[in-house]
């Protein structure tokens, strides 16, 4: 019988308890956007559904205000 290869080590949550999801917190938002500028999925981010919803709204708001690019054209 093969045991699963999961490690017993707990992962750190991607968003710490003190961090607030806000459109002005660009360093936080950049961690959840791919190199192409796409918002990463909830499974890749390891966020709760509420956190993912708030993150999506904040990223879209930052894009409209030109704080984050819609596309990353650095080739």
Curated annotation (Swiss-Prot):
PROSITE patterns: RIBOSOMAL_S18. This is Small ribosomal subunit protein bS18c. GO terms for cellular component: chloroplast; ribonucleoprotein complex; ribosome. It comes from Marchantia polymorpha. InterPro entries: Ribosomal_bS18 (IPR001648), Ribosomal_bS18_CS (IPR018275), Ribosomal_bS18_sf (IPR036870). GO terms for molecular function: rRNA binding; structural constituent of ribosome. Keywords: Chloroplast, Plastid, Ribonucleoprotein, Ribosomal protein, RNA-binding, rRNA-binding. Belongs to the bacterial ribosomal protein bS18 family. SUPFAM superfamilies: Ribosomal protein S18. Its main location: plastid. It is found in: Plastid, Chloroplast. One of its GO terms (biological process) is translation. Part of the 30S ribosomal subunit.
